[in-house]
Amino acid sequence: MQFPKACLITAALGVWSVLCPQSLAAQDSFVALAQVGGDGARVVDRGDGATLSLTLSQPVPYRIFTLTDPLRMVIDFAEVDWTGFNPIAFDQAAAITAVRVGGFRPGWSRMVLDLSEPVAVNAAQMLRTDEGATLHLSLEPIADTVFAERSGVPETARFALAGDPVELGPVARVPIGSGPLRVVLDPGHGGIDPGAERDGQRESDLMLAFAQELRDVLVRAGGFEVVLTRDDDTFVPLETRISIARAVAADVFLSLHADALSEGQAHGATLYTLAERATDEASLKLAERHDRADILAGIDLSDQDDVIAAVLLDMARTETEPRTDRLADALVTRLQKSIEMHKRPRMEAGFSVLKSADVPSILLELGFLSSPKDRANLVDPEWRHTAAQAIRDALGAWVEIERDVALKTRP
């Protein structure tokens, strides 16, 4: 298999043109461009697919999509210096016939894989390492018709920086039960952070769809006001998600996810509340993966974590924690009656997105994309509706519980 020499590519009026290699200027949040490090790129042909690994000097945002006529897979990065990149590393995959790399637009770099057959990304993950980060992609063959249906440039994928303003005015919070319950639904990931991916299903897409359906269920029921942290394929930093909840004086913050495990056979829904120490090692790693999204987006969370820590110290949590516990209990009770939950349905971990001290906050893993059964559930409209109704009933039950608690503790 012959590969062309590594080259830069640019787009003008929709037409790709080939340029000679040149250095790229640093852009956006990174001190320097990510370098292709060590072994650079490796591809292992498995016969029924291929595994691609790209070693970088630091983690960067990325997105993947496919194109037809001819068959191509495109991987955008923010941002990579391709100096020294050797495309010969791809000569072990029959599905890949050529590779081109270069600048895409200011702040972004692109890799284009020419394909000999239709393939899909079965799993995608960028893992931090001591040397930087490695992007792992698992490719598998798919039918021509499926490839065509999934292909196309993602027009709505955007990236919001941490400093972008949230145009929401302050709203006064009222006692629980004295008015509509104001619920902030947080569909995890989005934009350049797709979350977990399995069999062509992206966590960001599935959670957005579920959040929109859950919003509709709550609004139709009456007694709820619902705000989504994102309503399209947009990347929203963790701090911004928290800011949205506080800006609208949320009564409840519910973050929705569907993670994937590299090992084990875990399945079923799991509910997480905030704790400094995770329930177990798996919960700790899960929190690290979720929080890594902002790192991948080039956002420095160190100062923000200090701010959040100060808020946690300054604000009384003696009221919020019991309310969160009662909310978690209500959710587990209703969900267990309606859908299958994990053998440990409620756990704790240090998710940054739950660190709003004055808003009861829950992270709900609706299932594991690494579980075929859970994947089937997440794409099943009937299952999603059943889960949404259970959450609606749990929120209603929690309102009654809080009203009773308020009456009993009234001076």
PLM features: residue spans?
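Hydrophobic anchor at the start of a short beta-strand
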Residues: 62, 225-226, 361-364
